[in-house]
Amino acid sequence: MAVYTDITEDELIRFLAAYEVGSLTSYKGIAEGVENSNFLLHTTKGAYILTLYEKRVNADDLPFFLGLMHHLAERGLSCPLPLPRADGKLLGTLSGRPAAVISFLEGMWLRKPEAQHCREVGRALASMHQAGEGFPLKRPNALSVEGWRPLWRNSEARADEVQAGLKDEIATELAFIEEHWPKDLPEGVIHADLFPDNVFFLGDRLSGLIDFYFACNDFLAYDVAICLNSWCFEKDGSYNITKGMALLSGYESVRRLTAEEIEALPLLARGSALRFFLTRLYDWLMTPPGALVVKKDPLEYLTKIRFHRAIVSSAEYGLRREEAPA
């Protein structure tokens, strides 16, 4: 369920009068997503998405998110484009919530992505990193290494309810990552949540990236690590090096990783796995029955943490570099 706030047809028509989208012909709630209320609108000029931003989203972050989408779309990245109101602003108010009208993106997310899709994702991620250059607003990553210990404190006492020995294992893991987390890697705007359900395809062609509501400023290679975790593991927990090779080669066809990024990639992947483990663990333990948050199994990411812990070189992820001739 992703419609937390209902709207009436009359108030929607009044709201849309500030946009050049034609007359409303129909609208319906969209069940995808968990953070906001989303509606598919049909008007005499086409299809649009209406998003009402709920309390889980910090309203102070909305200028960053909407401005970023506008910036990326203007630079050729295929992503939803927030439409300006008559007053030039990208944000209005509907049913007491901040609200925006966003262009409709054709496509659907893949339930079973293959290597060729991973290559397209790598290309698109690198294109996003390049398109994000020059975006003037900044948003620190609240879910990077500095934010993991507060998350862990909230779940630590009950961790062994999920698996025996988990408390000690994660405490050791977190301490190691905090001590060894890299510094001075190339930074920029990252998506930070580019899971398969945030990438649309039309057939085998990538049609666009969506859901920029975790976007922030951080290491570019950390975004690559998130994608390795979210695109390149199979349901049985095994790493698919063919998918990894495709994703990394796709990324490097647009933006080449530095030597420092390549060296740091195993630790970034390990940290990325820990980040999603910790948020899943918190929701698993703290979400009351009947809540709208969909709980996801944290142990999926524990398996990934253990895999990355054994990695010695980025080549084990599928990164291939030809040596220069002597």
From Swiss-Prot:
GO biological process assignments: threonine biosynthetic process
One GO MF term: homoserine kinase activity
EC number: 2.7.1.39
Protein name: Homoserine kinase
NCBIfam families with a match to the protein in the record: PRK05231.1, thrB_alt
Keywords, comma-separated and alphabetical: Amino-acid biosynthesis, ATP-binding, Kinase, Nucleotide-binding, Threonine biosynthesis, Transferase
Disulfide bonds: none
Annotated organism of origin: Rhizobium meliloti (strain 1021)
EC top class, as a word: transferase
